[in-house]
């Protein structure tokens, strides 16, 4: 039964991810006094891209064609490890912090290789920037979640949720707040949101993620965009269910699963509104200021770990 719930959780993430991106776009447009595209616009864009012909550069190798599938598969795999509806889940023994970080790095690694493969100037520039951001961001993800693992006594994501549900007082600890702030900053960087990157631009010299996918078209581009939306949802799930796990089901009952789904949707809505408001209030940072922001998040995560050690 737990395997069915895990499969349903992955399918739910696949279905909700494009809508989450569309919701953020729609709310940003409303906050800027624009009508904006409908929430379901990303679904229409994916449908259009899957129907389009694939155009590949003559200089591209097999790696360029294989990368979108690896990126998409790694993103889908993370949805099965993160506790979304129930904890512990069927793949709980494999849902370790280290596995999650390496799956996230796998997608970033192949995306950077795909940007370098055709030999275009924009792709190489974006790949170098993406690797720089990932080198600063991924250790912060590990440290932020590790601070929670210290309190729970396990690096298993499901066990962290169960331990937090058993002792709700730890959610108001200083280490908890510092880890949440660190992971929130990393979420902005890893998903290409403002102030680190602007997801609405395609021809800026300062772009990061979009520079690596300029050579892609058709179903390859659709898979990469879908994977990026799934990655955003996974980070939202980490922020919502690891730090505020109320609503996550501990038993496989119909009422518990429905409550878990409703609470998860509510958390997604709150985080989407937060991102939309933030992106309408802040400007994009200069590229050389991005490492400074990520260094702040790393220090916050380090303080969270130190706080967890001191307050044990």
Language model features with spans:
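Juxtamembrane/interfacial segments at transmembrane-helix boundaries in multi-pass membrane proteins
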Residues: 89-93, 147-178
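Transmembrane alpha-helical segments that form the membrane-embedded catalytic/substrate-channel core
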Residues: 19-27, 107-115, 181-198, 269-278
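Cytosolic juxtamembrane amphipathic/interface segments immediately preceding
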Residues: 45-64, 121-125, 213-220
